[in-house]
Amino acid sequence: MAKNQDESKEKRKNLVLSRFRWSEQWRRPWDDKWLRWYKTFRGIVPKLPEGEEDRSNLHIPYTYSTVDAVRSKLLTACFANRPYVSFVPKDADDVENAKNMETLVDSQMNRTDVEFMVRMYTLITDMLIYGGCPYEVGWRYELRKIKRKVPMVDESGILLGYEEQEIEVVNWDDPDFQPFMIDDLYPDPEGTSIDDCSWVIRRRYITRKELEAKIDEGIYKVKDLEAINQAGDRISEGKQDRLAAIGAADAYADEADVGGRRYELLEMWEDDRVTTVINRTEVIRDEENPFWHGKKPFGFAKFDPLNGEFYGISLVEVIEHLQAELNTTRNQRIDATSQTINRMWIVLKGMGLEPADLVSRPNGIIWVDSMEEVPKEVEFKPPDPAAYQEESIIKADIQEATSTYNEARGAPSDTKRTATENAIRERATNIRFETKLRIFEALGLKRLGFFYDQLNQQFIDDIRSIRISGEDGGYEWQEMRPEDIAGRFEYQPAGSSIEPTLDKLEYRTNLLNLYNEFKEDPEIKTLELKKRVFEAFGIKDTEKLIKSEEEIMQEQQEELAAQGELQAMLAGGGGLLPGMGGGMY
């Protein structure tokens, strides 16, 4: 039996390694592109040839400013409102549970120790640089030992002092969202998306301490740790290649240079199975997919998807050659200007002049035997004014390709336009951003909501006390049981739309005037009109702010009942309120 298990693991190991090599070979052209785009984003330029070190070799950070403009707009639009993801019930019985799940997920995404925004920031950054960014969502359970001071009292209750005690608490028992480098994702070359791939391999690196912790938890089963150690140390190749490209690390560093021993894990996920190979020598995990949702626990956010292709188009890819042209144009202009500033001379051989004699100095004198032997200055023409116009054309091309005009960057416009022209231009720009926003919401936030939902329903098996913000600005606590979050839901990102800034104020003002004009009109549905007003201010979850017709009717009935009680009290007390008589107090 043991022999059959060993043979089965050997087959699985060979399958993982063969698929890894296949994906690695297929992905190689993208590896070169990713490194090139990373260097463009970081502003890394090749060194000048020997003897030409005095030439200008600048990188103009226009790619960075373009990425930053798009990144800021996407991040602001997606996370303008909380909760970031709304849960919509599929069945009528799940309305209340959808609200509970929404509250739970919102609290999990906004834990003070989660740094959700930082992770989203890095995800969007990588997506813009490389065209996509993979992320993994699993369940994380973590215990932590903390020290506390406990009061010590005697039998009579007198405080004697404090004793230091060490206790173990649950530090994390929630979903864990982790973006990771695109270099560490090896997809099925035949697939076009995570779900479409028959398998996906994630490469990761862990320390010995992390490995031993997983062994203790029973997740990994190691047969021969010594053989694994002898297989050699591993380094994060993609990360080291990037750092080496900017001169920040040695791509061939040994273990001492990267902080100690690392173990490479090749984790192959199929919809129904997961297999992990360590240091390409031994299978340490081979089991059924532990997640109820039955999917690979990955997502892949794309900036610009292409039909039939796994990787999309990168923002840096679009402007890469324009950035190179911008660098060349600026450096050529600087070199030309330097030539006009740094004067050169034509001097006959044998005149006895030294180069130092031709250096400009106060009251300087150049001695010659004849005026015919006067050194002649070499004249260089200053750069043509058209060279400055060329840079503006290049920047305009970049702005047109990425829809990041000066107004979107917070810079003044180069051209004077009328207010109408600016409004039309901004609407067209925002339509393009809105499209990119919808793609990111579909591939990022909706899938993230799906994972959080499914993992919560699977792993929460006790009563949870959720901290929520109260109406008075304080905090309230809401208890939730597993049955309170069960159900089938759909996911709707709650971010605000990207509105034109030039005409939105006028639109809102007109809408408010319209509301004031018709709010008392019996033929107008006032609630629907109120929704339009809220939506004009970018608020989507209007149902949380506007009372339903049922709630309004109930309040009216309660008010009528209260008035009836008051009238009855007045009638029974002779028209006076209780406690009031005709005398003096």
Where are these regions (language model features)?
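C-terminal anchoring/interaction modules
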Residues: 1-53, 107, 127, 135, ...
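Basic/charged alpha-beta structural segments of nucleotide/phosphate-handling enzymes
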Residues: 69-70
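Long, contiguous juxta-domain segments that are non-catalytic but functionally important
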Residues: 56-62
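Juxtamembrane loop-helix boundary motifs flanking transmembrane segments in multi-pass membrane proteins
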Residues: 93-97, 390
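Helix-loop-helix transmembrane hairpins and adjacent membrane-interface loops
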Residues: 85-86, 135
